[in-house]
Amino acid sequence: MYIAMNRFKVLKGSETDFENLWKNRDSKLHEMKGFRTFHLLRGPVNETEGYTLYASHTVWESEDDFIAWTKSQNFRDSHKNAGTGKVLTAGHPRFEGFSAIEGA
């Protein structure tokens, strides 16, 4: 099992727009081999720096399945409008990938 996460620093006041963007997107994940599940996670608010932390969380059967997704036409189609609208985040997302330890 492989878990892929992107962490986003969403500017305070932009949380609803950010969540709606994800809710209304045309996701192609379910069409991909090895895809198991997706969750958008809301984390803590950082009052000092003015953002709310979010993470997109996907679970895949393998890292190879995730990599195939990132190289697919479905990935390109799903991300074709990224960065074209109102600025909702402080900087680019931060990717983190994890392989599950079998038997742990």
State what each model feature region is:
Residues I3-F8:
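Active-site-flanking beta-strand signature of metal-NTP-handling nucleotidyl enzymes
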Residues L41, E96-F98:
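Solvent-exposed beta-strand sheet faces enriched in polar/charged residues
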Residues V10-F18:
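Short, surface-exposed ligand-recognition loops at beta-strand->loop->(often short) alpha-helix junctions
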Residues F98-A104:
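Short, low-order "capping/linker" segments at domain edges
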Residues S27-R36, Y51, V59-E96:
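An amphipathic, aromatic/His-enriched active-site/gating alpha helix that lines ligand/cofactor pockets
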Residues W22, D26:
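Short amphipathic alpha-helical/adjacent loop interface patches that line ligand
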Residues K9, L41, H57-V59:
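Short hydrophobic/aromatic beta-strand micro-patches
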Residues P44-E49:
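Acidic pyrophosphate-coordinating catalytic loop
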